[in-house]
């Protein structure tokens, strides 16, 4: 199945800041997004309040996304302490 990706405004703002502050992490996230398109079910599903969402860790940062049909909705990218 081919997936489309939608980015939330919050995620786009986070990436814009990250591009200026940490180019290496920015590039890691871009690479992982390309992998995500091919196999979004591979990543860990969340539970409780965040049931229905999945996560990808990048060091101390967490990317949270949701799969809806053939669309992957990227919700947020934030420090682990602020994500949950």
Residue ranges and their predicted role:
Residues 2-5, 9-10, 16, 20-26, ...:
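Enriched for short, Lys/Arg-rich terminal
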Residues 13, 31, 41, 45, ...:
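Residue-level signal for pocket-adjacent positions within structured domains
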Residues 31-56:
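A short, surface-exposed loop/turn module that caps and links secondary-structure elements
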């Amino acid at each position: 199945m081919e997936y489309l990706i939608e980015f939330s405004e919050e995620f786009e703002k986070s990436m814009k800041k990250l591009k200026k502050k940490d180019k290496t992490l920015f590039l890691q996230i871009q690479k992982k997004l390309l992998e995500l398109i091919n196999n979004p079910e591979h990543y860990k599903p969340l539970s409780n309040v965040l049931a229905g969402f999945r996560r990808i860790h990048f060091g101390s940062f967490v990317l949270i996304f949701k799969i809806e049909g053939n669309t992957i909705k990227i919700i947020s990218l934030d420090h682990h302490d602020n994500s949950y």
